Design a protein with these regions (language model features):
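Glycine-rich beta-alpha loop elements in corrinoid/cobalamin-binding modules
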Residues: 2, 26, 33-167
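Glycine/Thr-rich phosphate-binding loops of Rossmann-like dinucleotide-binding domains
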Residues: 13-14, 78, 130, 181
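A short, acidic/glycine-rich surface segment
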Residues: 13-16, 52-54
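N-terminal hydrophobic or amphipathic helices/low-complexity stretches enriched
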Residues: 1-7
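Glycine- and acidic-residue-enriched helix-capping/strand-helix junction motifs
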Residues: 14-27
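Short polar catalytic/cofactor-binding loops
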Residues: 7-13
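Short aromatic-enriched loop/helix-cap "lid" or pocket-rim segments at secondary-structure transitions
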Residues: 17-18, 161-162, 171
Length: 183
């Protein structure tokens, strides 16, 4: 199963003055953890990569991910929802999952406000995202998957929060090797 992580920018396709760019570390750790557990991974960082709708749609068709995990802070939540909307219009079979500070603080409200997100991950994401991807791969029900908000027959359901990871040493280093630092 192929999982693509997308680091969402503040705006899509508009020039924003940036003073520095940082590797999306949390997303890199999530993806490395998935790879460690047998998933094929990729990272699209639209904070540094050029974005056009046409190139994004083509990339969806070429790379054919099963799951896309969006990472967004509050200023970029509308950009994230725009990406989710494009995904649902052009590749509706892809499961769109979102995490990050905005949805972490407002998981249920975010599900109501942004209907194109299939699943919201809140709280510490590593074990939640792994379990979620494993359930989706095996076509298992999401009920009981701690740390998510999802829909059941159109109704928004918030599962219980997941306990914090006790041993952070079990997590791998971020998957920096999947990024082209040349550009």
């Amino acid at each position: 199963m192929k999982v693509i992580g997308i680091s969402c920018p503040l705006t899509l396709g508009k020039h924003v003055q940036i003073t520095s760019i940082h590797f999306p570390l949390s997303l890199g750790v999530l993806l490395a953890y998935l790879r460690k557990n047998g998933f094929e991974i990729g990272l699209w960082d639209y904070n540094v990569e050029e974005f056009t709708e046409a190139s994004f749609i083509q990339r969806l068709k070429t790379e054919k991910p099963d799951i896309i995990g969006l990472a967004a802070m509050t200023p970029g939540i509308k950009s994230a929802h725009k990406l989710a909307t494009l995904i649902k219009e052009h590749a509706p079979q892809i499961t769109v999952i979102i995490g990050g500070p905005h949805v972490d603080a407002l998981p249920v409200q975010s599900a109501k406000e942004f209907p194109k997100f299939d699943i919201i991950v809140y709280g510490e994401a590593e074990d939640t995202f792994l379990e979620l991807c494993q359930r989706l791969e095996k076509k298992k029900a999401l009920k009981g998957c701690q740390g998510i908000v999802h829909r059941v027959k159109g109704k928004i359901v918030q599962e219980l929060p997941r306990p914090l990871i006790k041993d952070l040493d079990k997590l791998p280093y971020a998957a920096r090797d999947i990024v082209n630092f040349e550009n």
